[in-house]
Amino acid sequence: MSPKSAFTYRDYEALPNDRRRYEIHDGELCVTPAPSIEHQIILSNLVRALMRHIPSVAPGLLLFAPLDVILSDRPDETTIVQPDCLYIAPDRMALTSRRGIEGGPTLAIEILSPSTRTIDRVTKRGLYARYGVPYLWLIDPDTRAIEAFRLEGDRYVVAATAARADPVDLPPFTGLALVPDALWPTPPRDR
């Protein structure tokens, strides 16, 4: 995409507030629908579990979408993402600003959905690696599993996987004892 047609942060700020999720990947606008109720329940359960752990063992800042993570604000390669959840360790607190997070958080967490599966697994994973996000979790409601990745050089390697009811530590946290089965929603009522 040429710089003239690339989306910039200024273009991004002018987008409507219409319940869609807008991101810019290397100057290209990416639009996805609002998350499903299942997605939101998983996110809520995850945030609750992490909030029990973070203040006492891993000081830092836990935030969740919608929140702009501005990986690059250059006119020719603007990249703005909205991970479902993110963690900022104390050594990265300077990244916080009125606009959002300006740089790579310590941990980005994406909950896969039918409309974002390829974007999260391929596009955003590549962007997070390029911009130096040390850790990435991909949560898959279909397989009821969590993959935790650690950045080595310019690529992610699997650091841990989690499924079922076994408590597990996932990097960058120690002593977390996250129980994956506690994240999944109970089946919704039919109406």
Each predicted region: which residue ranges?
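Gly/Pro/Ser/Thr-rich low-complexity, intrinsically disordered segments predominantly at protein N-termini
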Residues: 1-191
